[in-house]
Amino acid sequence: MMKGGMAGLMKQAQQMQEKMQKMQEELANAEVTGQSGGGLVSVVMTGRHDVKRVSIDQSLMSTDEDDKEVLEDLIAAALNDAVRKVEQSSQEKMGGMTAGMQLPPGFKMPF
């Protein structure tokens, strides 16, 4: 590889690292909302997987043991939905970073 080619690759790597750091900060501060039960339960989560808020529709509030189990299932489903959305958002944004870069075949990024 020519000396200029190596310098170009190093410059690209440095630029990518800077972009990755900025993107990771943006992703960490982004919020997604996971839902279940047709919106009866919703969870707001950050890109760091921190739960900011859980909302439960009043119609689900009951002292009946069966209703309690349904509510627990809906909360778990809403949390899982939020986690999937965080992961999907992260993959989409980070995957777009390598577009247009001339990376060697088979080169994999650390994310």
Swiss-Prot record:
Main location (coarse class): cytoplasm
One GO MF term attached to the UniProt entry: DNA binding
Keyword annotations: Cytoplasm, DNA-binding
GO CC annotation, single: bacterial nucleoid
Region feature Disordered, mapped onto this chain: 1-25, 87-111
Coiled-coil regions listed: none
InterPro entries in the record: YbaB-like_sf (IPR036894), YbaB/EbfC (IPR004401)
Pfam families registered for this protein in UniProt: YbaB_DNA_bd
Localisation: Cytoplasm, Nucleoid
Domain of life per record: Bacteria
HAMAP family reported in the protein's UniProt record: DNA_YbaB_EbfC
Family statement: Belongs to the YbaB/EbfC family.
Function field: Binds to DNA and alters its conformation. May be involved in regulation of gene expression, nucleoid organization and DNA protection.
Subunit structure: Homodimer.
The protein's name: Nucleoid-associated protein PP_4268
Species name: Pseudomonas putida (strain ATCC 47054 / DSM 6125 / CFBP 8728 / NCIMB 11950 / KT2440)
